[in-house]
Amino acid sequence: MGRCLRNHSITYKTPKVPYERERFDAELKLVGQFGLKNKKEIQRVHYMLGHMRTIAKVMLMKDAKDPKRLLEGAALLRRLHNLGILPRDQNKLEFVLALKEENLLERRLQTLVYRKGFAKSIHHARVLIRGKMIKVGKQVVDVPSFLVRVESEPLIQLADNTPLTNPEINGRRKRKNNHAGKEDN
């Protein structure tokens, strides 16, 4: 038996106060609005945003002419612009501090599939993605939390091997009905 060589880094952090009415209500609203599976997905987004804010705060504390601030600050802003989390016209580190969870959740594949009209609901979008019926470019993506880059957004489409795009491929319900019809004969 070999060793597991996976990187087990922290992906989320639980809240310090476990039971807060206001936070519960806000999280429940986000879960319903974005079709999340559980609260851990919100905590993961919150952790990512906190990490980005921490980097921005450290860069803002440095001198404006500091080469490290210029380099790392530009890298952070470029990454956020490429992901579409931060609009192109907001190119200062102060705007990173004003980001909310909704900004990050809007860039998830699940949300974009629903917004583009491939799915009837946000939950149906999750089912399509987990069923490997959505591809970004040439790659089939089955992770609903996949963050879509701005240049990849127009490339979101239905996969070729699905009953939705290819009428020759029977879906599960159609196969079951065909099978039941053959037994009656």
Swiss-Prot record:
Region forming the signal peptide: none
SUPFAM superfamilies, A to Z: Alpha-L RNA-binding motif (SSF55174)
InterPro entries: Ribosomal_uS4 (IPR022801), Ribosomal_uS4_CS (IPR018079), Ribosomal_uS4_euk/arc (IPR005710), Ribosomal_uS4_N (IPR001912), S4_RNA-bd (IPR002942), S4_RNA-bd_sf (IPR036986)
Gene3D superfamilies associated with the record: RNA-binding S4 domain
GO molecular function, one term: rRNA binding
Region (Disordered): 161-185
S4 RNA-binding domain segment(s): 107-179
Gene Ontology biological-process annotations: ribosomal small subunit biogenesis; translation
Gene Ontology cellular component terms for the protein in this record: cytosolic small ribosomal subunit
Short name of any one Pfam family annotated for the protein: Ribosomal_S4
Keyword annotations of the record: Ribonucleoprotein, Ribosomal protein, RNA-binding, rRNA-binding
Sequence similarity: Belongs to the universal ribosomal protein uS4 family.
Name of the protein: Small ribosomal subunit protein uS4
